[in-house]
Regions:
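Phosphate/nucleotide-binding beta-alpha loop and adjacent structural elements of enzyme active sites
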Residues: 1-270
Length: 270
């Protein structure tokens, strides 16, 4: 059966190669956003994995928590020190732009996007790992719309050591790469850069360098996957066809029933 890919840029396809045959594992998703749409972890959860989801938007965190009872889902932000920060939450039609990064918000506002502001408690990745993670971490995903450096500055990558780290590496709604602000943190922690996929940069811990080969090749027909958004459209079209064909099916049944009644009446009259 083909793999169902939910991630925006097929990140889950590359990761599925790296962890082929694994029905259990542990992931950390900082900036989890949604339990299904563009989720880098949905495929793995469906296999039997579990993990830690961090989402600063209260409604989205609640949605993830309801959909993922095996997971730990926290409604907090992640930064380089604990405390409280202003979270800029975009309107629902652009929810993926929500961020703690003030400079990115100003650019988006100039382009016409609207945000509401909330004070949200923040902690560090190191503190989250110490409190909630008690097993090896297979992969970490960071998708925080311009706040990557602060997240990585608050990590302890010698103690909390995911095998693979995937970081969104372009500025929101731009092709400009942003890794110059934060990549040195990963390299100094003995992570090796593997590949840039046009949106994200992938890194492997040097002691797991054997996983790099599985990440290097772009998703392709050999991966045997179906993009979830395509499946949604297919299912919707099937439903439309079913709805449109209902009158035809009813008419056919009516004709069949009428013919049966007519035959019965003819036999009765003989």
């Amino acid at each position: 059966m083909p793999m169902m890919s939910y991630a925006q840029n097929r990140e889950d396809v590359r990761l599925a190669r790296a962890f082929a045959g694994r029905n259990t594992g542990f992931y950390v998703d900082v900036g989890a956003h949604d339990p299904v749409k563009f989720s880098i972890t949905k495929h793995f959860y469906d296999l039997g994995w579990r993990g830690l989801n961090v989402e600063a938007a209260e409604g989205l965190a609640r949605k993830i928590r309801e959909a993922r009872p095996r997971d730990i889902t926290l409604n907090v932000g992640v930064s380089n020190r604990p405390g409280s920060l202003t979270f800029f939450q975009a309107t629902a039609d652009a929810a993926g732009l929500s961020t703690f990064a003030h400079d990115e918000v100003e650019r988006h506002r100039a382009a016409g996007f609207r945000f509401t502001e909330h004070q949200v408690p923040v902690t560090t990745l190191a503190a989250l790992a110490a409190e909630h993670i008690h097993e090896p971490v297979d992969f970490l995903s960071i998708d925080v719309e311009g706040f990557e450096r602060e997240v990585l500055e608050g990590s302890d990558l010698e103690t909390f050591r995911p095998k693979i780290i995937v970081v969104e590496a372009t500025r929101p709604l731009m092709t400009e790469q942003s890794h110059g602000r934060w990549e040195a943190i990963l390299l100094s922690a003995r992570y090796r850069f593997v590949v840039f996929d046009g949106l994200n940069r992938y890194y492997v811990a040097e002691e797991h360098a054997d996983l790099a080969a599985a990440l290097e090749v772009p998703p392709n027909p050999h991966d045997d996957f179906i993009p979830h958004e395509y499946q949604v459209q297919i299912d919707a079209l099937r439903q439309q066809l079913d709805d449109q064909s209902l009158p035809i099916r009813v008419a056919r049944k009516l004709v069949s029933a009428t013919a049966a009644v007519s035959r019965f009446a003819q036999r009765r009259d003989r």
